Amino acid sequence: IVYAILLSVAGLIFSLLINQLCFLLALSSFTVSSLYNALFKKTGLLGNFMVSFCVAIPFIFGAAMADGISAVSLIFFLMVFLSNTAREIIKGIADVEGDRMRGVLTLAVKYGGKYASKVAFLLFILAILLSPMPYILGVMGYMYLVLVFIADLGFIYSSIKLIGNPSKHMALRTKKQILLWMFIGLLAFLFGTIFA
């Protein structure tokens, strides 16, 4: 715990050396993660949102460190936030038995795997609707569009399969598949930047 605190303090100090906005972003991420660990681990969807905020904030932080926060950096933040929240919900389907015993109020625990899988699908669709925007705005090159299209198809395929069979086994399988589609999405971001 002491080591983690020291690292967090060091990170906050270094972010302040960059600029005030980076410090505020780092502080917000530290605050959200601390609150999650202390109070909100068992809150289900709210906890999912908090985890996803911390996962997605590096896109905003990177923009603040470079040229400043833009519409495209906010789009990437939202895409990662939405898709990671969907994955957290799917993790809840896979862990529903243990979560129920521990009193974790995930969507799967409260409303069942079928309902949770549909919410995850909806979040993926929202992220997918945003995905062409960086190309349309002229920030990303054609390689981005090709790779993000593959990732989008993967998200749709995996989430539809889960709706059809929202079992623990299928949720575990889907959770792993989602990591692959996310990795392809990351490649889309990298190659789209290089070949812009």
Predicted regions span which residues?
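Intramembrane alpha-helical segments
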Residues: 1-71, 75
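Multi-pass membrane catalytic core of lipid/isoprenoid biosynthesis enzymes
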Residues: 1-27, 104-140
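Interhelical loop and helix-boundary elements at the membrane-water interface
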Residues: 1-3, 34-54, 99-118, 161-184
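Residues within membrane-spanning alpha-helices of integral membrane proteins
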Residues: 4-8, 26, 30, 48, ...
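Transmembrane alpha-helical segments that form the membrane-embedded catalytic/substrate-channel core
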Residues: 31-38, 57, 78-93, 150-162
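Alpha-helical transmembrane segments
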Residues: 71-83, 140-144
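Extended hydrophobic alpha-helices typical of membrane-associated regions
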Residues: 136-196
